């Protein structure tokens, strides 16, 4: 695979290899055949980041080869959304001959939605001033004249200039209902929107008929919490990043959901609060004991669950675990399988043509 060519003819083979690999990794814990969810074969990534290479009067997007570290020119990127590809061409055309906008520009980040909105961030090794803002506003207006629904942001050391806003609102059809998700620049969002829809619908399916409340750790902008709220009496969710918490609160209101409570704290801190080890001012007014959480949902970072959180989640009858790293999932399962068994197993091809796998398990108490 090269940045400008996807081996789409190999899609089925690479997916089949992942299924075999996941089954092998999960063999000590389950003999289930994974439920498999396919990605679009191209234009599946909703965000992308590129370094900018200055070559005389020219400049262009590049990425670095992971093995050789050599730079690769990228003029089109079929893994990314069609809107990102349009913007890549338009941004280079708009910046190349503009001394103010191109000077010390070293990176451009793109974030897009299925609803055809975009945030483009330009990163600089220089101070950004009023002249930069004026030129950036002219570029934004020129892009919009091309029917590109785009918001521009300038970033430099300790500086962020959002010309209009630093977010876009995604609209996803999830099990017959449209979900609105505010996505903030430089915050985590699911990269493959089509797969995100399938993950949300799978999570809804495995939790249908649930009793009691749901606890979610690492909730981000409320991606899963809000979609799953319809299956539970109440949802209690934790997140540490301020922009994500703010987006989650907006999303609760935008989706007219009244049974989700977001707490800004780390999973490790919440574990301490639940165990009565520490009290937190952030929990004032929230009666943790009133929640009857029968199900816990975790979508941890690549490092997986720490040992204290492992112990904490074992107290719940059902564990829904989405993993971007099956190796750490299996490491966690060495502990979790002592008290729980695997009821459902799914593979989501979030990152086609790479070795990365996204998978999920539903665990129930033995």
From Swiss-Prot:
Q: Which EC numbers does the record give?
A: 2.1.1.-, 2.1.1.35
Q: Name one GO molecular function term.
A: tRNA binding
In this chain, S-adenosyl-L-methionine is annotated as bound at: 190, 218, 223, 239, 299
Against NCBIfam families, the record matches this protein to:
trmA_only
Q: Which gene encodes it?
A: trmA
Q: Which reaction does it catalyse?
A: uridine(54) in tRNA + S-adenosyl-L-methionine = 5-methyluridine(54) in tRNA + S-adenosyl-L-homocysteine + H(+); uridine(341) in tmRNA + S-adenosyl-L-methionine = 5-methyluridine(341) in tmRNA + S-adenosyl-L-homocysteine + H(+)
* Protein family: Belongs to the class I-like SAM-binding methyltransferase superfamily. RNA M5U methyltransferase family. TrmA subfamily.
Keyword Cell cycle attributed: no
UniProt-recorded name of the protein = tRNA/tmRNA (uracil-C(5))-methyltransferase
| InterPro entries with a match to the protein in the record | MeTrfase_TrmA_AS, MeTrfase_TrmA_CS, SAM-dependent_MTases_sf, TrmA_MeTrfase, U5_MeTrfase_fam
Recorded hits in Pfam families, A to Z, give:
tRNA_U5-meth_tr (PF05958)
Catalytic-site annotation from UniProt:
324 (nucleophile), 358 (proton acceptor)
Protein keywords: Methyltransferase, S-adenosyl-L-methionine, Transferase, tRNA processing
Q: Which HAMAP family does this chain map to?
A: RNA_methyltr_TrmA (MF_01011)
Q: Does the keyword tRNA processing apply?
A: yes
Outline what the protein does. Answer: Dual-specificity methyltransferase that catalyzes the formation of 5-methyluridine at position 54 (m5U54) in all tRNAs, and that of position 341 (m5U341) in tmRNA (transfer-mRNA).
Q: Which domain of life is it from?
A: Bacteria
Q: Which GO terms describe its biological process?
A: tRNA methylation
For this record, the Gene Ontology CC terms, alphabetical, are: cytosol
């Amino acid at each position: 695979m090269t940045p400008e060519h996807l081996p789409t003819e190999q899609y089925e083979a690479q997916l089949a290899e992942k299924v075999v690999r996941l089954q092998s990794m999960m063999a000590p814990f389950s003999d289930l055949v994974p439920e498999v969810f396919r990605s679009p074969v191209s234009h599946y990534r909703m965000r992308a980041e590129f370094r900018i290479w200055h070559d005389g009067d020219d400049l262009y997007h590049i990425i670095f080869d992971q093995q050789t570290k050599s730079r690769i020119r990228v003029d089109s990127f079929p893994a990314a959304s069609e809107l990102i590809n349009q913007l890549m061409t338009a941004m280079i055309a708009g910046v190349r001959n503009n001394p103010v906008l191109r000077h010390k520009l070293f990176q451009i980040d793109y974030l897009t939605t299925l609803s055809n909105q975009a945030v483009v961030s330009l990163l600089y090794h220089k101070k950004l001033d009023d002249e930069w803002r004026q030129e950036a506003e002219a570029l934004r207006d020129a892009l919009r004249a091309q029917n590109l629904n785009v918001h521009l942001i300038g970033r430099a050391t300790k500086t962020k200039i959002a010309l209009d806003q630093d977010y876009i609102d995604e609209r996803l059809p999830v099990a017959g209902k449209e979900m609105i998700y505010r996505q903030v620049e430089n915050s985590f969002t699911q990269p493959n929107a089509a797969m995100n829809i399938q993950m949300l619908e799978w999570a809804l399916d495995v939790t249908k008929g649930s009793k009691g409340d749901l606890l979610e750790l690492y909730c981000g902008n409320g991606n899963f919490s809000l979609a799953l709220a319809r299956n539970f009496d109440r949802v209690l969710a934790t997140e540490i990043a301020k922009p994500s918490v703010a987006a989650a609160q907006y999303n609760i209101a935008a989706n007219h959901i009244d049974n989700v409570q977001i707490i800004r704290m780390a999973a490790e801190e919440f574990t301490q609060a639940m165990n009565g080890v520490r009290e937190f001012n952030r929990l004032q007014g929230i009666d943790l004991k009133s929640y009857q959480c029968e199900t816990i949902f975790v979508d941890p970072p690549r490092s997986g669950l720490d040992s204290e959180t492992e112990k904490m989640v074992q107290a719940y009858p059902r564990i829904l675990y989405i993993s971007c790293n099956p190796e750490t999932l299996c490491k966690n399962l060495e502990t979790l399988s002592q008290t729980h068994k695997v009821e459902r197993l799914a593979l989501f091809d979030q990152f086609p043509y790479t070795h990365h796998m996204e998978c999920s398990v539903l665990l129930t108490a033995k």
